[in-house]
Amino acid sequence: MHTIWFYSVFFLVIIHDGKTYSRSSQWHNNGYNAWSSKYKMLTNVYEGKNLEFGFPSDDDRKTALRKGLYDPDSPLPIDVDVYYPPSGEEPRIFVTIPRFGQGVPYSLAYLTNEVRPNGTELQPFPDYDWHKSHGDDCDGLTSVYRIQIDTCGKMWILDSGEIEFKQHCAPQLVVLDIATAEVKHRYRLPKGMYKPTISRFVTPYVDIADPGPYGSCKEAFVYMADPTGTGFVVYDVKNERSWRVENKYTYPDPDFGTHTIAGESFELLDGSFGFAVTPRGLGLRRMLYFHSLSNDAQVAIPLDIVNDPAYWGNGIKSAMEHFVLLGKRGVQCAAPAMTSSGVFLCGHLEPIGIFGWNIFTPYTYQNRMLLAENPTTLQFISGLKVITNPQGKEEVWLVSNRLQKAFSGTMNYNEINYRILKCGVDELLLGRPC
């Protein structure tokens, strides 16, 4: 049975298995609702001072170092996703490491059980050959920012095609069978869908009409964020057709171009960045929720509009009357995620934490709850997922990476810089220990 969450200004009411529970909240000194506990400790899955890359052989490692293709101080993890094998084996945890510089030996990896001095060892996925050309082979993977794993055991990979912000290959969407590494689908974006030397595709969001275990996950729309190109691309997988959405709602706001995290600031003007959609079965018109990283506006548009190419032939004037400005946060929000009951989660920069908003309520500060605050462990949540485990329980998984220190050059590799954390959705929303 689904858990149903009702938010009001001061109370969270839960109806679960026929019983009703409530939990009061306290008014936070920044004007947000917050639970009474000061700092939330999520379950620590991984932490590292730096990333530990494994190689097929010691010779491969030495070659990468010699050619400048591996710089231990260059990589930065951006996203995380989890695959629970149907056989009941231990979950596989995947991370992305975009090639901001030349020194990233591979851009998509999984965590092993091998612990090394700086953290758990990574290994390339699907294998080293997919990454070793460093942009010379566009049938491989060049630079992956984020991924999404579906309920059919497939990984949807958005490859920006860049290394050190230079376009080597066209941006592409690659769908791999996780168990076999077989390519199930590939779509290279046509030139009309991206802006050469400007675009940078960083986030895919896949909305699937025929999910597993009974469906094949082939009827899907994919929304691909292009923050530097200030827009996003919609891709109809079944018909292999795409169109671009770009207007004032997908742009950055200069007033939010300065990002401050834990007292350190950097400048970044990024447009469209993160997506979520209305879950099925809630009785609502389904919407695509999106926001720009360098903006405080939360925007929505009906899925039946954004998924129809007939609306998108008039440039920046296309379908303007269908966009809904839900509200403004007054602060930047990075990676979002959505629970099955309609709680929109996002990692805010200030205060440093995860906020929740019930989509049945207006997007106001009274209805945005500070669910987890931790100025140490949650410094820039660059990847955030809601994943259903084999027991049917929803979990929040995230990666935090202290992005401000990478931008300012103050990363201290004697400290823990990167974390993968998780918490049950029920525990997060109820303020219980993870």
Feature locations, PLM:
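Cleavable N-terminal signal peptides of Sec/SRP-targeted secreted and luminal proteins
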Residues: H2-T20, L173
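Beta-strand-rich domains and repeat architectures in extracellular enzymes and scaffolds
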Residues: S25-Y106, Y145-R146
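Surface-exposed loop and turn segments in beta-propeller and other repeat-based domains
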Residues: K38-D71, G119-D139, V183-S199, S242-E267, ...
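Beta-rich, blade/repeat-based domains predominating
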Residues: D71-E90, H134-M155, M193-V222, Y251-M287, ...
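Blade-loop segments of beta-propeller domains
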Residues: L76, S107-E164, Y187-G192
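Beta-propeller blade signature
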Residues: Y106-R116, A170-E182, F232-E240, N412-L428
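Short loop/turn segments immediately following beta-strands, especially the blade-tip
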Residues: L111-P117, A179, V237-W243, I301-N314, ...
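Blade-level signature of beta-propeller repeat domains, shared across WD40, Kelch, NHL, RCC1
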Residues: I381-C434
